[in-house]
Amino acid sequence: MGRKKIQITRIMDERNRQVTFTKRKFGLMKKAYELSVLCDCEIALIIFNSTNKLFQYASTDMDKVLLKYTEYNEPHESRTNSDIVETLRKKGLNGCDSPDPDADDSVGHSPESEDKYRKINEDIDLMISRQRLCAVPPPSFEMPVTIPVSSHNSLVYSNPVSTLGNPNLLPLAHPSLQRNSMSPGVTHRPPSAGNTGGLMGGDLTSGAGTSAGNGYGNPRNSPGLLVSPGNLNKNIQAKSPPPMNLGMNNRKPDLRVLIPPGSKNTMPSVSEDVDLLLNQRINNSQSAQSLATPVVSVATPTLPGQGMGGYPSAISTTYGTEYSLSSADLSSLSGFNTASALHLGSVTGWQQQHLHNMPPSALSQLGACTSTHLSQSSNLSLPSTQSLSIKSEPVSPPRDRTTTPSRYPQHTTRHEAGRSPVDSLSSCSSSYDGSDREDHRNEFHSPIGLTRPSPDERESPSVKRMRLSEGWAT
């Protein structure tokens, strides 16, 4: 720390010169005072300014001091400005520079100090720039992640990575995984909507739906999967195409009756003969006919309470195991042509062969029920099944019995929890109660061999038929 140094030269500005003279004159007199007191000496100062004005200082009396001066004849020290400058140079001090006593204390700005301060400023700027580079902004995109739940249940979920992403982006699932998914599309169906006979009700507004955390169109909507809860792993094998937007595309897919290749434990009430016959009809059906009807799944659960946790499926999870598909139920699908202006591609052969076996009353009742329950289900995307590997058994020729063809069985009463999709269609217009349906269960006749064989055929060792009564849960 030191005073601000000024160069000892004549001050050109008169005002500044006057101020400097006043300050330094007082300073000089102050120093003389200190010297006289400290060292017990006599001091006399005689000063004339630039205007020849006299200023004097004497420690005791000026005249007394001047008298001594005139009478003193011994050699003494006498200095001038040049002598002072020379003495300062010898001591290593710059005679041209002198500290300003009137200036305030301040830091000396030498070239070395300025370089030091400049280097410090550069280091601070570098640290600030590094901190800005390290602060990476959050990403503004979504990365859909397709996660299969297990090896058998490949449901597609989309997980947005960033919370600041665009909510309008649609998750793009992998095509192969999407073909293995159980749902042909996402339906906007609230969980409170009732299940109308296992048919998907609601509107399919878009093929993929809005992006959500669970991969569905709306977190509050049902996934609307046409999956029987008991045969969830079996229905995976029936691949479905990627979802399409029926509102923007006039081409409509074909109707397929989904029959998963289940064992006797999972489908105890459907015979292997029926599986073979349905497999042949599905493979031989024409795929060019336009359909807009929901998929009818004949898969049944093994346990009433077994299902997809938390989400209501298209088929109610309270189905019992006593469920069989009768030929009248399959033939009742022909009512789609008249009631809803639809075509059955996979049941066409059954209509041509066995339509004459159905009475007009049953067809009219099924047609009225179909028009009632399928009025809101005309815009649904439908999966088309591929060829299914089903164990084949010899088919027995159908018998000509017309005892009670109009009364097809309802294996569960109206108050029971287990109902099949086709049973729900049939029971909406049926006037028979549970006791009437149970009375005619043993007398039912199927045109395509869906009924139980007669007692003489049942005991025949050459014909292998699975009994419909096996595995029924009472």
From Swiss-Prot:
GO MF: chromatin binding; cis-regulatory region sequence-specific DNA binding; DNA binding; DNA-binding transcription activator activity, RNA polymerase II-specific; DNA-binding transcription factor activity; DNA-binding transcription factor activity, RNA polymerase II-specific; histone deacetylase binding; HMG box domain binding
Residues recorded with modification N6-acetyllysine: 4, 116, 119, 234, 239, 252, 264
Tissue expression summary: Widely expressed though mainly restricted to skeletal and cardiac muscle, brain, neurons and lymphocytes. Beta domain-lacking isoforms are the most predominantly expressed in all tissues including skeletal and cardiac muscle and brain. Only brain expresses all isoforms. Expression occurs primarily in the internal granule cell layer of the olfactory bulb, cortex, thalamus, hippocampus and cerebellum. Low levels in the cerebellum and hindbrain. Expressed throughout the cortex, including the frontal and entorhinal cortex, dentate gyrus, and basolateral amygdala.
Chain segments carrying region Transcription repressor: 368-399
All copies of domain MADS-box, residue ranges: 3-57
GO CC annotation, single: cytosol
One Pfam family linked to the record: HJURP_C
Subunit relationships: Forms a complex with class II HDACs in undifferentiating cells. On myogenic differentiation, HDACs are released into the cytoplasm allowing MEF2s to interact with other proteins for activation. Interacts with EP300 in differentiating cells; the interaction acetylates MEF2C leading to increased DNA binding and activation. Interacts with HDAC7 and CARM1. Interacts with HDAC4, HDAC7 AND HDAC9; the interaction with HDACs represses transcriptional activity. Interacts with LPIN1. Interacts with MYOCD. Interacts with AKAP13.
Organism of origin: Mus musculus (Mouse)
Biased composition (Basic and acidic residues): 434-444
Family: Belongs to the MEF2 family.
Residues flagged as site, Cleavage: 433-434
Residue segments, region Beta domain: 271-278
Protein name: Myocyte-specific enhancer factor 2C
Gene: Mef2c
Presence of keyword Nucleus: yes
Highest taxon, organism lineage: Eukaryota
GO-annotated biological processes: AMPA selective glutamate receptor signaling pathway; apoptotic process; axon guidance; B cell homeostasis; B cell proliferation; B cell receptor signaling pathway; blood vessel development; blood vessel remodeling
